[in-house]
Structures are given as structure tokens and as C-alpha cells.
């Protein structure tokens, strides 16, 4: 089957491009997983990932779905920058067809499979709280990391900070708030829905979803 992605209109293609640009800002060397289910394209990224092949560390996954003009079967991994370049090329040519670039090497988070079913709505969180938790985490990371610190230590510090629960009432990691804000999934004044399934928590709006395992660590 031809794996070219054919979008319904220019707005959908621009939506993919904008999402990839935001994801690239959060992880300049990051990967994106594309899964096509018929005419629905699921676009996964992971702005925060512990790097464990066992999936036992902090893993925060962003998901946005986009409708396609024709059915497709695809489950592949690409570098974000490569897929973004392909999308931008199609936009420049005024084309709605994107030819996927060469696939990327496997990354551990792409093998982690959050539940696809069994999600139960457990409440809502005000958008203002999500934004505040994201800003507080960014400030804490900046304060904790001197310019001279090594990259490996810096990565551990970031994971420590983003892995902390935002509070007793909402036991999801601060990294989920960071991803919701950074990926453009929140809108001023619009509450974020919270779903739970088998130890996972999903934050959802009309703009996208962020999925992570529950966190009960507060320091």
C-alpha cells in the first residue's frame, strides 16, 4: 500500500506542521511515531522520556490525531525534523500529499503502549493550573541547572523535577503539564479533562492529549 499521507485540506496539513514545530522546540533531536488507522492519523511524540527500554521511568507522550483524505496503514518512526521538512515541502508546493521520509532508529518510548481502551473520566483541571505548573517546573529546572553542568546530569535533574506529582489531588507528573502547554494543547479558560486507566493518566482537550503514568512522588 502507498504510505503517502493525503490530507483533507491545507488546514489539516498546516496543523501537522505546527504540531511538529512545537514538538521540535521541546526536543530538537526527537522522534515522532505515526500510526494510521484507516483515515485517522495518530501522531505521537515524547517530549520527556527517561530512556529506559523497560519503560519503568518517566515517560510523557503527546498525541494529536488528524483526519486523512484516504485510508492508510502505517506504523513507523521518523525524526521530527525530517517529517517536518517533508510537510513543509508539501505546503510550499501547495500539495496535500506528504511522502514520509526515511524511518528513524528505534527509540524506547515508541515501544511503550498506553491503554487504548478503558479510560474513565475522573475530573477536570483548570487551564490556569496547568499553565502555572508548567511555568513553575521550567523555573525550577532553570534554577537547578548551572550552565557548566554536564548533559547526563542535566537530564537526570530534569527528569527528577518533571517526574514529581503536581499535587495530592492530581497525581500526574509535572511533565504532563509541561507537555500540554508546550505542545499547544491548552486554550485560555478552557478546562482540561483528566482520564485514568490502569495506572495511566491522560490529559485531554480538543487540541490533543498527553499521556503519562501516575506519579505519587512529591520531592
What is each PLM-predicted segment?
Residues 80-219:
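Long, compositionally biased intrinsically disordered terminal regions
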Residues 3-4, 11, 67, 72, ...:
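Detector for Asparagine
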Residues 8, 35, 66-69, 81, ...:
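A structural detector for beta-sheet-dominated domains
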Residues 47-62, 171-178, 195:
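Short, Lys/Arg-enriched charge-dense amphipathic segments
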Residues 52-91:
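A broadly used, surface-exposed interaction patch
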Residues 1-58:
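N-terminal ordered "arm"
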Residues 35-42, 62, 102, 122:
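A sequence-level detector of short, solvent-exposed, charge-rich linear segments
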Residues 44-45, 52-65, 210-218:
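Short amphipathic beta-strand/extended segments with alternating polar/hydrophobic composition
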Amino acid at each position: 500500500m502507498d504510505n503517502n499521507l493525503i490530507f483533507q485540506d491545507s488546514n489539516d496539513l498546516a496543523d501537522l506542521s505546527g504540531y511538529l514545530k512545537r514538538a521540535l522546540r521541546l526536543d530538537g533531536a526527537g522522534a515522532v511515531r505515526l500510526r494510521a488507522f484507516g483515515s485517522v492519523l495518530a501522531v505521537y511524540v515524547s517530549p520527556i522520556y527517561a530512556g529506559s527500554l523497560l519503560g519503568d521511568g518517566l515517560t510523557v507522550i503527546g498525541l494529536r490525531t488528524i483526519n486523512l483524505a484516504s485510508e492508510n496503514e502505517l506504523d513507523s518512526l521518523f525524526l521530527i525534523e525530517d517529517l517536518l521538512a517533508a510537510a513543509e515541502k508539501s505546503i510550499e508546493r501547495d500539495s496535500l500529499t506528504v511522502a514520509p521520509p526515511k524511518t528513524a532508529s528505534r527509540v524506547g518510548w515508541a515501544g511503550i503502549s498506553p491503554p487504548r481502551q478503558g479510560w474513565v473520566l475522573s475530573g477536570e483541571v483548570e487551564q490556569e493550573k496547568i499553565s502555572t505548573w508548567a511555568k513553575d517546573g521550567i523555573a525550577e529546572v532553570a534554577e537547578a541547572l548551572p550552565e557548566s553542568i554536564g548533559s547526563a546530569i542535566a537530564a537526570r535533574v530534569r527528569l527528577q523535577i518533571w517526574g514529581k506529582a503536581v499535587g495530592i489531588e492530581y497525581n500526574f507528573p509535572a511533565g504532563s503539564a509541561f507537555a500540554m502547554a508546550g505542545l499547544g494543547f491548552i486554550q485560555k479558560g478552557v478546562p482540561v479533562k483528566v482520564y485514568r486507566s490502569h495506572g495511566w493518566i491522560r490529559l485531554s482537550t480538543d487540541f490533543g492529549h498527553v499521556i503519562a503514568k501516575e506519579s505519587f512522588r512529591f520531592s
